[in-house]
Amino acid sequence: MGPGPPAAGAAAPPRPLSLSARLSYAVGHFLNDLCASMWFTYLLLYLHSVRAYSSRGAGLLLLLGHVADGLCTPLVGYEADRAAGRCVRCGPRKAWHLVGTVCVLLSFPFIFSPCLGCGPATPEWAALLYYGPFIVIFQFGWAATQIAHLSLIPELATNDHEKVELTALRYAFTVVANITVYAAAWFLLHLQGSPNVEMARDASDQLGIQDVQVFQNLSLLVIGVGAVFSLLFHLGTREGRRPQVEEPDENRPLLAPTTARPLLLWRHWLREPAFYQVGLLYMSTRLIVNLSQTYIAMYLTYSLSLPKKFIATIPLVMYLSGFCSSFLMKPVNKCIGRNLTYFTGLLVILAFAAWVALADRLGMAVYAAAVLLGSGCATILVTSLAMTADLIGPHTHSGAFVYGAMSFSDKVANGLAVMAIQSLYPCSLEICCRACMGFYRWVMVAATGGVGVAATLCLCSLLIWPIRLRSWDPGAQP
């Protein structure tokens, strides 16, 4: 006899996401990625070299952005979890994504535009006060979009392999966003150059007030392209609705049997060891990725003394290698599992760190080193996001808080790390001296190899104590 028909009350197995649904989700963070690439790469350069603000003033605006982002991220995550589908047209995650997108669209162009009403006699502090509110609004919107988009992964994915695929596609579009920004910046600066070749060699390499229009046009291009992809996300992504609690009537018993799954609240996460294990691993991953991205240009320029074209070509090679490796995440995770996949990425990054430490001059081999760094960073970033989704599991109602807490630790750790590195800078002048030539080399070694060792220790803890909830008792009272 064959198996009987399914029980009447049995739930149908969830249908896997279609290709269009996966791609629609993946482009939902494209606007954030475009803005983040321009923010991290060009903000200090724009404020200091183009707008001629002091290094301290430009640094204060960047610090304000990090503080605002760090504070808004967990708060947005907590509020997103509290939302109970009040939006009629979309779910609570997409509603927060829409709010964040609007804030980014309205504020980001003003950050890379001249101060309205400011003149040559306007004091610097007044101009900084002008930019401050736009930066805070932008960082709030960026955090809301990021947390809402990340917390949709456990909601949409029906199995572990779909989680990896969604994070891999998300990272692939992050790479495309970075390539788009760098290519557009090169094109706009090329158009700004002088038709006289000899004059271009002297003038086009120096940024100044004449390049204000370049950055303003670049920010408008970023906003326009990002808005189109955000619209595609909202049109093609459907968030699952949470069942509403039915109102009791006079014919229903007051003491009905309880069948609903107990909720895992944010305060329960704080008592879970796995929450801190995955948090430390995610923080270490972000330190490797962000610090290497921040200091790779300094390393190429001052430690290796390479021409300026390498500042554009090497990051491009890094992102292209990361783009290609991101598509291998699903089959690799399926074959060897999360932990070994992450460890493989760490081995590639440690190989890059050893190469940089042992070789004074890389020459053209720097392209091969860039491939190692880009593919390794993509591997550990995608896998760490998949591990975070594993930690959340079916408890998607508090997933935004988990992602918010992870991002908060990431922002704080990166800010403190950059401050520590800058405080150790050996040159008292802005012009690089002989002492700083080796300084940036060892910064790259520490940012990749040193933090990579710390990430290895975090991974070992997950091998000993796998990702699962240990302290939460579903039968206990909240």
UniProtKB/Swiss-Prot annotation:
Acetylation in keyword set: yes
Membrane-spanning parts: 27-47, 57-77, 98-118, 125-145, 171-191, 217-237, 287-307, 309-329, 339-359, 362-382, 401-421, 445-465
N-acetylmethionine carried by residues: 1
Lumenal side: 48-56, 119-124, 192-216, 308, 360-361, 422-444
Subcellular location: Melanosome membrane; Lysosome membrane
Gene Ontology CC: lysosomal membrane; lysosome; melanosome membrane; plasma membrane
Biological function: Transporter that mediates the import of cysteine into melanosomes, thereby regulating skin/hair pigmentation. In melanosomes, cysteine import is required both for normal levels of cystine, the oxidized dimer of cysteine, and provide cysteine for the production of the cysteinyldopas used in pheomelanin synthesis, thereby regulating skin/hair pigmentation. Also catalyzes import of cysteine into lysosomes in non-pigmented cells, regulating lysosomal cystine and cysteine storage, which is essnetial for redox homeostasis.
Protein name from the UniProt record: Major facilitator superfamily domain-containing protein 12
Species this protein is from: Canis lupus familiaris (Dog)
